[in-house]
């Protein structure tokens, strides 16, 4: 199952690396080469074989999230405790006076959102299942969700929304109330459909909901999703160049020719960004490892989510589901 998928994925990545014509290093230009991938896979196999979820891990995670989010709150209030921003600027200068957006102890807001997509559902589910002395874990979970929203991490918000929508009926079913779980699921489906219809009929003039409305109307622009649509198109173009073996682990940044320029009237600066990441882990595998590599990656996820649906490790499972949904829009760089 899981071990077979990851073992085959590692072997395929090694073959792709050996036969790559791009001469990429073992580390990769963004620490996304074969060596980091091997470390991630071996870590996952070790955890799957010998690890298990314990309440004490949740407590340590809750403390870690609290510290990270406390720093983020200070930064959102205008302070610069970790010197993440240029001298004289704060978090709100992102995209105006300097390029990039940084928050918390992790820095990059996309990585922060990915971390909180893992942490918040795991903490909330542990609190709900254990109750008693674990109820306090709801506080760092709520704080993490608030920081995700305030940091405008769209991928993180999508991941947390998925955890809420999937986790609520799942939890009700775990408590032995399948009929109630089906009612909750039907109610959620009705709310989602109603929300989509509302966005379709009356969307705002700009922003994420405007872009969603345009997509629902069949009008798709490459600039949507902070240019993610264009980047995904670039990933598919790179896949078409080498559909079997891909370019090799960590070669997306070397092969991509996509660039964006943006003039900022408030500062008079022009920022140029190179698309050096697929902003979707599945598409990154497709471009770097070819179709077999992407299928093995998705097969490993399918095994994990199937185990969760069968009731194994519910707290860890909902966290992984949240991360997986986030990874469809995230940058996929390890934050450990």
Predicted regions and their residues:
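Hydrophobic alpha-helical membrane segments of integral membrane proteins
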Residues: 27, 155-161, 334-336
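Hydrophobic alpha-helical transmembrane segments in integral membrane proteins
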Residues: 200-212
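Acidic/polar, glycine-anchored loop/turn motif associated with catalytic or activation segments
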Residues: 235
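Cytosolic linker/terminal segments flanking nucleotidyl-cyclase catalytic modules
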Residues: 319, 329-336
């Amino acid at each position: 199952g899981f071990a077979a998928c990851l073992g085959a994925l590692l072997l395929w990545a090694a073959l792709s690396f050996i036969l790559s014509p791009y001469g990429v290093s073992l580390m990769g230009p963004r620490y996304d080469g074969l060596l980091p991938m091997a470390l991630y896979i071996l870590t996952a196999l070790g955890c799957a074989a010998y690890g298990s979820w314990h309440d004490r891990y949740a407590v340590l995670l809750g403390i870690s999230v609290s510290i990270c989010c406390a720093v983020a709150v200070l930064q959102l209030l205008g302070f610069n405790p970790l010197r993440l921003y240029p001298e004289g600027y704060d978090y709100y200068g992102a995209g105006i006076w300097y390029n990039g957006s940084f928050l918390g102890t992790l820095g990059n807001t996309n990585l922060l959102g990915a971390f909180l997509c893992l942490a918040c559902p795991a903490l909330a589910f542990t609190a709900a299942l254990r109750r008693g002395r674990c109820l306090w874990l709801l506080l760092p979970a709520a704080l993490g969700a608030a920081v995700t929203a305030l940091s405008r991490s769209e991928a993180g918000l999508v991941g947390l929304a998925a955890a809420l929508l999937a986790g609520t009926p799942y939890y009700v079913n775990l408590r032995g109330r399948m009929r109630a779980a089906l009612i909750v699921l039907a109610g959620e489906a009705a709310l989602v459909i109603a929300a989509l219809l509302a966005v379709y009929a009356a969307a705002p003039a700009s922003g994420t909901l405007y872009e969603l409305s345009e997509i629902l109307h069949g009008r798709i622009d490459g600039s949507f999703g902070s240019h993610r649509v264009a980047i995904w198109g670039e990933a598919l173009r790179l896949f078409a160049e080498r559909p079997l073996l891909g370019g090799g682990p960590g070669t997306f940044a070397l092969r991509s020719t996509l660039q964006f320029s943006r003039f900022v009237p408030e500062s008079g600066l022009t920022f140029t960004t190179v698309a050096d990441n697929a902003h979707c882990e599945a598409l990154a595998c497709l471009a770097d490892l070819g179709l077999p590599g992407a299928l093995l990656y998705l097969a490993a996820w399918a095994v994990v989510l199937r185990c969760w649906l069968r009731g194994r490790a519910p707290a860890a499972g909902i966290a992984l589901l949240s991360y997986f949904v986030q990874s469809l829009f995230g940058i996929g760089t390890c934050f450990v």
